[in-house]
């Protein structure tokens, strides 16, 4: 009788794969390179992940999933500007952590990979849309009209995305931290003014 597969084995291997990629590009992923890094057989990787493309998709989806908790937590809370801003700050502070920095690089690389390989459909490019939708929905819950909410959401999300890219390539923690705080403060001031303005 064949031995039953260990259900914890695949998640553990996926976590180890992501850890191994902290100092390697996503484009370098091969079954052989990962097998050597994890000290497992290529057969074990094929057994758990299938094809090379399926492996890449699972890696990207694991990277994307780590951001979902912050969005879901804010959506389940009472709609206040401070709760929304705190969720934005929490997300940014998470991105600034030394252990998270390599994951930012991998997420950016994954999104760019999907630009030239849309058949992968791993969801990396969808993260940007997800953040835009979250920000827009949060502002609408506060009473901002849809068009202005969408504009403000995109302005902040694109600012923070740009700062993440800067952080990855420059490593200027203090400079990027100051700029992110400025972007969030300006966002807070604009939304506060919008909410205080009389309805037309």
Q: What is each model feature region?
A:
Residues 61-68:
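Short, basic, alpha-helical segments at the C-terminal edge of helix-turn-helix-like DNA-binding modules
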Residues 12, 16, 20-58:
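Helix-turn-helix
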Residues 12, 16-24, 69-73, 106, ...:
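Solvent-exposed, amphipathic alpha-helical segments
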Residues 120-125, 141-200:
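Hydrophobic/aromatic-rich alpha-helical bundle segments in the mid-to-C-terminal region
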